[in-house]
A protein has these predicted regions:
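Sec/Tat signal peptide C-region and signal peptidase I cleavage site
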Residues: 17-23
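Extracellular beta-sheet/turn segments enriched in Thr/Pro/Gly and aliphatic residues
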Residues: 94-124, 192-223
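Intrinsically disordered, low-complexity Pro/Gly/Ser/Thr-rich segments with frequent PxxP/GP/PP motifs
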Residues: 51-78, 150-177
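A short, solvent-exposed beta-strand micro-motif common in secreted/extracellular proteins
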Residues: 79-90, 178-190
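Bacterial N-terminal signal peptides that target proteins for export
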Residues: 1-8
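Bacterial N-terminal signal peptides
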Residues: 8-16
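Asparagine-centered strand-capping/turn motif at beta-strand->loop junctions
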Residues: 31-37, 130-136
């Protein structure tokens, strides 16, 4: 979904060879707490330098219950970076903030309340992307970010979840009529990175599949 102006989403991830392994020390943490009295059903956390919202970070099969919380790790290229955040609850209320600043070394917490979920949520049309881990390794981080951003953004597996070999993670993506490209990166328990291109065309339906394969592994330094 295009931010503010229109619904427009498609999916594709761009791969680029790198000489360096993934470094978890580069991640910052953000925690979302639900004090609304209702279930939080979607959270979008998108780099502010992108015009697109990107995937729902909670996932197709999960919600944040009242009184609950979820923490996520975020990857961005600078000491500070701005993100746009939108959340919706089961009653159709919306929390929205733009240009929220994250700073290296400082954990952030956002608490959703009845007071700050005071707007009507937009009418989304969603596609579901099922990502399967077809490697022999446990995927510990999964990033999907709009191609027009310099940041990888948020790890869609949250702070406690992983994607073991053979397992599938379902991701909800708001879609419109246009194609939009995203970058996808997975990192395993060895901090090896897997990247590949993927395009989801809204004209072809609302259900899509992708798999992380051994051949998606980035080459090691010097290869």
């Amino acid at each position: 979904m295009r931010k503010v102006t229109s619904l427009a989403v498609l999916f594709a991830a761009l791969a680029a060879a790198s000489a360096f392994a993934f470094d978890p020390a580069e991640l910052n943490k953000i925690t979302f707490q639900n004090s609304t009295g209702a279930r939080i059903e979607t959270i979008f956390l998108s780099p502010s330098d992108s015009e697109y919202w990107g995937p729902d970070i909670i996932g197709a099969d999960f919600v944040i219950k009242d009184g609950g919380s979820l923490g996520y790790y975020i990857h961005y290229p600078e000491k500070t970076f701005k993100f746009d955040i939108m959340a919706t609850d089961e009653a159709g209320h919306m929390f929205e903030v733009y240009n929220y600043v994250l700073t290296d070394g400082k954990e952030s917490t956002i608490t959703f309340t009845q007071k700050n979920l005071n707007s009507k949520a937009p009418e989304f049309t969603f596609a579901t992307l099922k990502v399967t881990n077809n490697t022999d390794h446990e995927v510990q981080y999964l990033f999907i970010s709009p191609e027009d951003s310099d940041a990888w953004g948020v790890d869609l597996l949250d702070e406690e979840s992983t994607l073991t070999a053979g397992d599938t993670h379902s991701i909800v993506i708001p879609i419109g009529k246009d194609k939009v490209t995203y970058n996808l990166m997975a990192a395993d328990e060895n901090n090896d990175e897997y990247v590949f291109d993927l395009t989801i065309d809204p004209a072809k339906g609302k259900d899509f599949k992708a798999s992380i394969e051994a051949e998606d592994l980035k080459p090691a330094k010097g290869e």
